[in-house]
Amino acid sequence: MQFIFKTSVVIFLCVVLGYLHADEVFTHKDWSVTTYDSDPEFIKYSTHGSAVWGHEFGFLKRAGSCDEDNIYVSWSSTVKLDQLKEMEDQKVLFDLHPDEQFFQFAVPNLVVNPLLGSEYLEIPNSLNVMLFTNYFPQVTFSPSLEAGRRISVKVNEKDPHHRNFDIPDDEFSLEGYIAARQFAVEQCEIRTQALKIKNQYKITMR
């Protein structure tokens, strides 16, 4: 089950990194909820960094497991792609401070891809994006976010991969977190029911 989930997440994140077919379906204050036509099982709710807008902190929900929140961290780096690729499938230790509280999570790095420009977006320097996910925080983490106003996310200085991060820390607003999470739950439940109906239809058509 773990392997199947991980494989699905990798496929999904490849789509996310390409910013393909993304549909921002809900926004409240600093948080938004995004769905993907190419992989409708996943719902992402997240916010952007205050130091680097391209840094993203949030969670993934998957249809069929709506009570689970899979942490999602996106980080950019100008370190050479080959060096960053060596970090794939490795865990990176993050220090997280929602207001005065402290948590420490070792989150797997599943995907590293270059951020490519387009006719609408020019990227002058080589920029790579790293995705960290497939980690489900302890149950006390979400209540701390609900009660907080901001969260700082930092790569632990003793982590061997710390050198791969140009900017190893950032702050994220928690304004809008509660509403975004609730909307993500609702979307997840709707999609779960749709999948059940689809699967039942497949069975009856056999």
Q: What are the residue ranges of the model-derived segments?
A:
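Hydrophobic h-region of N-terminal signal peptides that target proteins for export
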Residues: F12-H21
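Bacterial N-terminal signal peptides that target proteins for export
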Residues: M1-V9
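A generic "folded-domain core" signal
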Residues: A22-R206
